[in-house]
């Protein structure tokens, strides 16, 4: 159905992992940046606590129409709100304060850092931000690769690893997930 662009979709094992993480977190408020055809959103929505809601941020009406159909078919559409506009606008319009439990970022790589900062400012202590594609096909370790997306992911990985506000671990599932937990105030490193 999707052809070669289907590679933009998360892998099934990543979907199962996102569902499990959302359940472990008892997430009631989740954000996804980059929705594509909605598989990752289904995975997160299935793991939400009763009454939980997922805000999906995307710019493509074409792909999110497919997502909306899949959400209906999966029985999770009532848990998802979709915003079609640049994610930075959607995130900056969210209320200040620690209201987000869980976030998944899988969108334009050059803006990962911006999305990180906007979500982190609204993430509860011990909340989780998960980034996709952090291995980027192995190209992040090849310093000769100076493509814009590769540089952005490499910089994000380095920044988050040294950010004292969080602790993180890279998980080599599919193209790599970076799990980033917000530290509680006064938490000892």
Set out the residue ranges of the language-model regions.
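S-adenosylmethionine/decaboxylated-SAM
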Residues: 4-189
């Amino acid at each position: 159905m999707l052809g070669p662009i289907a590679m933009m979709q998360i892998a099934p094992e990543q979907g199962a992992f996102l569902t499990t993480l959302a359940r472990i977190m008892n997430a009631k408020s989740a954000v996804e940046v980059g929705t594509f055809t909605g598989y990752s959103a289904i995975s997160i929505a299935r793991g939400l606590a009763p009454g939980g809601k997922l805000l999906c941020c995307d710019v493509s009406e074409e792909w999110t129409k497919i997502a909306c159909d899949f959400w209906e078919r999966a029985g999770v559409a009532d848990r998802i709100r979709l915003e079609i506009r640049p994610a930075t606008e959607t995130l900056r319009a969210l209320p200040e304060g620690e209201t987000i439990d869980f976030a998944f970022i899988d969108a334009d790589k050059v803006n990962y850092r911006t999305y990180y900062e906007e979500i982190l400012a609204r993430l509860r202590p011990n909340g989780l931000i998960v980034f996709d594609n952090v291995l980027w096909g192995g190209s992040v370790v090849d310093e000769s690769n100076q493509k814009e997306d590769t540089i952005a992911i490499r910089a994000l990985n380095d920044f988050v690893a040294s950010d004292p506000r969080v602790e993180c671990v890279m998980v080599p599932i599919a193209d790599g997930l970076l799990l980033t937990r917000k530290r509680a105030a006064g938490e000892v490193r």
